[in-house]
Amino acid sequence: MTHQASPPKKSSLILLLMTMTLLAVFPLDVILPSFPALSGHFRTTPSEIAWSVSIFAVGLAVLLLLIGPLSDMFGRKKLLLAGIALSAIGATGCLFAQDFAWLLAFRVVQAVGCGAFALSQALIQDVFAGRELERIRIWMTTGGGIFISCSPLMGTWLQLWLGWQGSFYVFIVLSGAVWLWSVRLLPESSSNHIPSPRQFFSGYWRLFSDIRFVGYWLISALAFACHFSFIVMSPLIFMEHLNLSAYQFAWAMLLYGAAYVFGGVLASLLHRKIPGDTQIITGLWLIACSGLVMLGLTWQFGVSAVTVLIPMLICTAGTTICRPIANSKAMSLHPTLAGTSTSAGSLLIFMGGGLISLVINMADNHLTSALASSFLLLSAIAFVLNARIRERPHVP
């Protein structure tokens, strides 16, 4: 499924995908400063609220299994529109939830809808190719970093003016805007073919039988898990353990987001100078170094905002350097299965991030040590995967 687009069409598509990226930060990032308010309103602990975010990611990962194959068979546009509408319905339900169980239920509905956002990878694959494709992925990662950097501050303002419901209000409004924009911009693409269960999952069998495909997505997933685990744990570390105010937390995360943007800029520069494999290795080395730095600083000076942020700035630079290239290499292996490839990769990314953050959350009073140890372990696994991939040539 390939659509040739003129430059203005490409520019409009990039803007739409950037807006979708902005929309995607609300369920996981903008809501972070509202952890204390949510725990108070629903009479639960901040750790359980963090646990709910991890469950959101795991549920999203499972549901992504269906999105890709359906998009390859029935078209991206209809599924994207249905997903955006469903995510808005889930967010609306969260506003009217009477207890924590209902909040979780409607968060699952929101997660089902948000699964459609993974189609952005396939939409990029449909329009761009080669070095331009890799460059667009880097831009998307950088754009995501900008939104992530601003999201805690935005969440703090929304919490101040609208309460914990604020992020859901804005999510609903943005969903409506993206839905209307998608109706106008995206071309119709559909199929009347109704697949059998065997046909439906045959694409996954083909993809997961390719060690290079699985390896590149696992590298991206392991790097993402480092970032995601910190995001989920950050309210617990800064607001609960270090007693930072919501605004202090927001400014600390703004600095973290700035590092995310810097990593994207650095990735773009490195992309012009060095091969993709070297860029992946560079990013993984930075993640490993961040784990060592965090262990060293916290052992020498104790846990503080500074001893946590310095290694996290290194880690996020590594994440943004290696992930776009790993994603592009994985997606380029099976271009005729772009939607299924997106779902398979997103499954690994969100499942890994959700499960690893759940494990780290169990550390309770030793969150920084658990984070640092996970950075070392995950980067080591990624190094082994990268070495195995380079030993095996791709067979089309």
Describe the predicted segments one by one:
Residues 102, 131, 138-184, 251:
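Helix-loop-helix hairpin linking two adjacent transmembrane segments in secondary transporters
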Residues 100, 106-144:
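Cytoplasmic helix-loop-helix junction between adjacent transmembrane helices
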Residues 86, 90-93, 101-109, 306-312:
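Paired small-residue
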Residues 327-365, 375:
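A late C-terminal transmembrane helix in Major Facilitator Superfamily
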Residues 62-100:
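Conserved MFS/SLC helix-loop-helix module at the cytosolic interface between two early adjacent transmembrane helices
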Residues 2-7, 187-217:
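Juxtamembrane intracellular "pre-TM" segments in multi-pass secondary transporters
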